[in-house]
Amino acid sequence: MGALRGRWAEEEALRFLLGKGYRLLWRNRRTPFGEVDLFLEKDGVYVVVEVKQRASARFGAPLEAITPGKVRRLLQSARFLLGRDDLPVRLEAVLVHGTPKDFRLEHLVLEL
């Protein structure tokens, strides 16, 4: 995903999640395990959100880019950012299908 398109997709994902009552804690935070796109909180649960965007299915669906290894690294990043591993953490994805002129969002909870 290009930098401008990636930024746009993250903006749309964040707007969507804030509208659902999430509270933003960090954005684009780097850890030794990788970067966290969005780190939020909702109802006492910390939520790591991976944002994936595809303009078309030519290079695969956005979900295909979220591998088991990526899920593991996201969880490690969450624990690193929190500084402990006994707090409730949920991993989610916002998949952005399309372009700024014509898109739809898909919001998923990722299995650990």
Curated annotation (Swiss-Prot):
Going by the entry's taxonomy, the superkingdom of the source organism is recorded as Bacteria
Q: List the disulfide bonds in this chain.
A: none
Q: What InterPro entries does the record point to?
A: Restrct_endonuc-II-like, tRNA_endonuc-like_dom_sf, UPF0102_YraN-like
One Pfam family, please name it: UPF0102
CDD domains in the record: PoNe_Nuclease (cd20736)
Q: Name one GO molecular function term.
A: nucleic acid binding
SUPFAM superfamilies in UniProt: Restriction endonuclease-like
Protein family membership: Belongs to the UPF0102 family.
This chain belongs to the protein called UPF0102 protein TT_C0005
UniProt organism field: Thermus thermophilus (strain ATCC BAA-163 / DSM 7039 / HB27)
